[in-house]
Amino acid sequence: MVNFFGIRHLSPAGAYHLYHFLEEKKPKIVLIEGPSDLNEQMQYFMHPETKPPIAILSYTKQSPIKTILYPYAEYSPEYQAIRWCKENKTICRFIDLPSKVFLAFSEKREKQEQKEEQWNVYEQLDKQSGEDGHETFWERTLEHTQDALAYQQGTEVFGKNLRELEQQREEDYAETLVREAFMCRKIADVIKEGFKEEEIVVVTGAYHVEGLKCWKEVSMTDTQ
């Protein structure tokens, strides 16, 4: 069975628990939610002269210029996963849609937001949690837990709740399904390369764990 570890980006607890999870599992390959066309940039993360925080900037060349910034701190789970792979001479890859696709998504989203106020799934979660906000909810229930298993299980539940809410927003959820189908395809490709399921760890936002666990059924085809 493929090992999945759901995170929250820029979560110190996630970075800590993930590093120790990798120490326990000793995978032969680690797949990370991140633009797959930026894999060449990963080599610079652990360069002796590179000191976090760092970021990768993707941009268009035609006016109006569109940009997307991918930030990483030392306490980013993704950064710690890359660090572990470097230390243990383990293959590490980003598996999400290429950044140029996200740039196209952002342009489409901007046009949509001009027509209507953006629906915020986190506001809906805040109402359900009874907290001052989802940040407070996360801090209280997950960020301070010292139990790695409790963190992992808690993030999955948190992600499932987000998915249930976003399904009410069909256009946003459709984008999610495309991303997950692409990432599922990347997982399937790794299996075809000869890796066993138990040798793989997939690091992704907690929101996507449930969608990616169905990788055998929903992976993207060549035509798609």
Each language-model region and where it sits:
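Compositional signal for N-terminal targeting/processing segments
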Residues: 1-224
